[in-house]
A protein has these predicted regions:
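N-terminal glycine-rich anion-binding loops that anchor highly charged ligand groups
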Residues: 21-35
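Enzymes that bind and transform nitrogen-containing heteroaromatic metabolites
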Residues: 3-25, 40, 60, 64, ...
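Zn2+-dependent cytidine deaminase-like catalytic core
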Residues: 31, 36-132, 216, 290
């Protein structure tokens, strides 16, 4: 129970950097001496100190370290990247014990960090709150194990399951829901829409309702029908345009030529190559349905305005899963789903 308490604190610390560590995972670390936390830290962003190093640096009396336990939510790294291996630093400082939440499935780690520490004669325990630690880095693990980005589907629908009225932009989500969605955009690496959504709504796909980073924008526009003066082509964020016409870069816009056959699968493969760890798919209905039919999704979020009846327009995607959780947002509800297949 004591180990779980400190690993839970590691998770809390790691969550402070959601959306900022790509392509690295979220990691938190706590150092405990005689039942008292004497140091803690988390990984802030790629290229900067890892969680363990920040925790070590925060310890005022370094002489206590050989009699201390270091807790870390993810297996310490074992390779030289932009920073030296944390496993070697832990061995060098001679910690009494190391407690790990989840093992790191990345090819360069994958048990090597734990082995370095164990071979140095330091007691190592792993798998503490493993499920929670894996869920913390669901994007990172999906990216490395499934070799594709973590996919979140999101749409808003009326009580009679339409996404708009008369195929025109229609207000379905309330202001509270919009804030929540913009937080989600800040958390995910990229955001994706199709041609029809770009033409009809002319969205900028930036994070406006809260203070935060803009995700990488992804546009599926097979025949390049979206005019270059539309908001998606603004210089506010890096933008990838998957199409069947041309390849090349123009400022912050990258055109990626992709075969029409197995388009979604080929696009996800390319996004993996580009180190995009997660995408939120915001529409339209046809694009969302393609992801659903191919079973290429990890989580789905449906915003429902049950009191709104639109009678006609774009029909919401066909989706028959059972929600894992339902939250009220005033006159909206949001249903959350996880793919168990």
């Amino acid at each position: 129970m004591q180990d779980e308490f400190y690993i839970r604190r590691c998770i809390e610390l790691a969550q402070k950097a959601i959306g900022n560590t790509y392509p690295n995972p979220l990691v938190g670390s706590v150092i405990v001496h005689n039942g008292k936390i004497i140091g803690e830290g988390y990984h802030h962003k790629a290229g900067e100190n890892h969680a363990e190093i920040n925790a070590i640096n925060s310890v005022e009396d370094k002489s206590l370290i050989p009699e201390s336990t270091i807790y870390v939510s993810l297996e310490p790294c074992a390779h030289f990247g932009k920073t030296p291996p944390c496993a070697l630093k832990i061995v060098e400082l001679g910690f009494k014990k190391v407690v790990i939440g989840a093992m790191d499935s990345h090819d360069k780690v994958n048990g090597k960090g734990k082995k370095i520490i164990h071979d140095a004669g330091i007691e190592v325990v792993s798998g503490v709150l493993e499920k929670e630690c894996i869920d913390l880095n669901k994007r990172f693990f999906t990216y490395h194990e499934k070799r594709r980005p973590f996919v979140v589907l999101k749409w808003a629908e009326s009580g009679d399951r339409f996404m708009d009225k008369d195929f025109k932009p229609t207000q379905i989500s309330n202001s509270l829901t919009k804030q929540f969605v913009h937080q989600l955009r800040n958390n995910e690496h990229s955001i994706l829409i199709g041609t029809m959504t770009a033409l009809r709504d002319n969205p900028s796909l930036t994070t406006r309702e809260i203070v935060g980073r803009n995700p990488i924008r992804i546009l599926i526009d097979i025949d390049l029908k979206v005019p270059s003066d539309f908001n998606i082509y603004s210089n506010e964020a890096e933008t990838l345009v998957f199409n069947s016409v041309k390849e090349g870069e123009e400022g912050n816009i990258k055109f990626i030529k992709t075969s029409r056959e197995n388009f979604i699968e080929n696009m996800l493969k390319k996004l993996h190559e580009l180190q995009i760890q997660s995408i939120i798919v915001e529409g339209g209905s046809l694009v969302l349905q393609q992801f659903i039919d191919a079973n290429l999704w990890d989580e789905t979020m449906i915003i429902k305005n049950k009191n709104l009846v639109l009678e006609n327009g774009t029909k919401a995607p066909r989706f028959s899963e059972i929600p894992l959780e339902i939250q009220d947002f005033r006159d909206n509800v949001i249903e959350f789903y996880k793919n168990s297949h």
